Amino acid sequence: MLELLLQPFNYNYMVKAIWVSAIVGAVCAFLSAYLMLKGWSLMGDALSHSVVPGVAGAYALGFPYAAGAFFTGMLAALAMTLVRHITRLREDAIIGFIFSTFFAVGLLIVSLNPTSVNVQSIIFGNILGIADEDVLQVEIIILVSFVILCLIWKDLLAVFFDESHAMSIGLSPLRLKILFFTLLSACTVAALQTVGAILVIAMVVTPGATAYLLTDRFGRLLIIAIAIGAITSAFGAYLSFYLDGATGGVIVTLQTLVFLPAFFFAPKHGLLATRYRTRLKRRHPPVHLPEDNL
């Protein structure tokens, strides 16, 4: 029995897949906590699709896909940030416009160069076939991103919670947002290898959403989100060996299975707890004393 459980670790490609999935899942979860705080989950979706033209263009021109993905991801992030600052358009309109534009350009490039673009790798990822140089590239991206996030997490919290207060204490919201989106773009590029462009959104939303239901303290939220992201990603890669299924699909399914109990049974913000409090308020409405009795 033990030999069967340890069997995936006998294969170098599985060890690499589990390791890379764990570190990518951890840092994506770190970022997801801020996306939940700001209500920017759609931003993660937009960035995950905005890297498609970069990947497709890099494949078509023979350049490293990571460089192309990072370039278009950063371009999309900067466009969304700057357009928000110089126009009166709502954020959801800006995100929807840029998301659809970049994804359309990516599909156009794929249609023009169908033989030079590995569409399946873009959409579903290819973590089991990741090369050693790609592992090193992902490790560098994740390490740099994690160190920067650990250094500025309180500054980002101030900006995402209250920009006016952040400015009053000498922080630059615009610069910190650009830095955040730079890190988000870099981690999106890393996550492409793990789950592909379509499912990246789950890795930068689900862990943070789950943790958001379980605690009101941001420090704890970060720890819970990172733990969920790392464990589900590593175990998903491990489990995919036995299921013989898409690694990205297994990872995201596991994250959803962790989210659902929190959604229903979280002690304070779960669906059942919320409904219970609502019923109590209906049965025992607050008593308002007349002003003469105060």
Curated annotation (Swiss-Prot):
<dbReference type="InterPro" id="IPR001626">
    <property type="entry name" value="ABC_TroCD"/>
</dbReference>
<feature type="transmembrane region" description="Helical">
    <location>
        <begin position="246"/>
        <end position="266"/>
    </location>
</feature>
<dbReference type="GO" id="GO:0005886">
    <property type="term" value="C:plasma membrane"/>
</dbReference>
<comment type="function">
    <text>Part of an ATP-driven transport system YfeABC for chelated iron.</text>
</comment>
<feature type="transmembrane region" description="Helical">
    <location>
        <begin position="194"/>
        <end position="214"/>
    </location>
</feature>
<keyword id="KW-0406">Ion transport</keyword>
<keyword id="KW-0410">Iron transport</keyword>
<comment type="similarity">
    <text>Belongs to the ABC-3 integral membrane protein family.</text>
</comment>
<keyword id="KW-0813">Transport</keyword>
<protein>
    <recommendedName>
        <fullName>Chelated iron transport system membrane protein YfeC</fullName>
    </recommendedName>
</protein>
<dbReference type="InterPro" id="IPR037294">
    <property type="entry name" value="ABC_BtuC-like"/>
</dbReference>
<dbReference type="GO" id="GO:0071281">
    <property type="term" value="P:cellular response to iron ion"/>
</dbReference>
<feature type="transmembrane region" description="Helical">
    <location>
        <begin position="169"/>
        <end position="189"/>
    </location>
</feature>
<dbReference type="GO" id="GO:0055085">
    <property type="term" value="P:transmembrane transport"/>
</dbReference>
<feature type="transmembrane region" description="Helical">
    <location>
        <begin position="140"/>
        <end position="160"/>
    </location>
</feature>
<dbReference type="GO" id="GO:0010043">
    <property type="term" value="P:response to zinc ion"/>
</dbReference>
<keyword id="KW-1133">Transmembrane helix</keyword>
<dbReference type="Pfam" id="PF00950">
    <property type="entry name" value="ABC-3"/>
</dbReference>
<feature type="transmembrane region" description="Helical">
    <location>
        <begin position="17"/>
        <end position="37"/>
    </location>
</feature>
<keyword id="KW-0472">Membrane</keyword>
<keyword id="KW-1003">Cell membrane</keyword>
<keyword id="KW-0997">Cell inner membrane</keyword>
<dbReference type="GO" id="GO:0006826">
    <property type="term" value="P:iron ion transport"/>
</dbReference>
<feature type="transmembrane region" description="Helical">
    <location>
        <begin position="51"/>
        <end position="71"/>
    </location>
</feature>
<dbReference type="GO" id="GO:0043190">
    <property type="term" value="C:ATP-binding cassette (ABC) transporter complex"/>
</dbReference>
<feature type="transmembrane region" description="Helical">
    <location>
        <begin position="93"/>
        <end position="113"/>
    </location>
</feature>
<feature type="transmembrane region" description="Helical">
    <location>
        <begin position="221"/>
        <end position="241"/>
    </location>
</feature>
<keyword id="KW-0812">Transmembrane</keyword>
<keyword id="KW-0408">Iron</keyword>
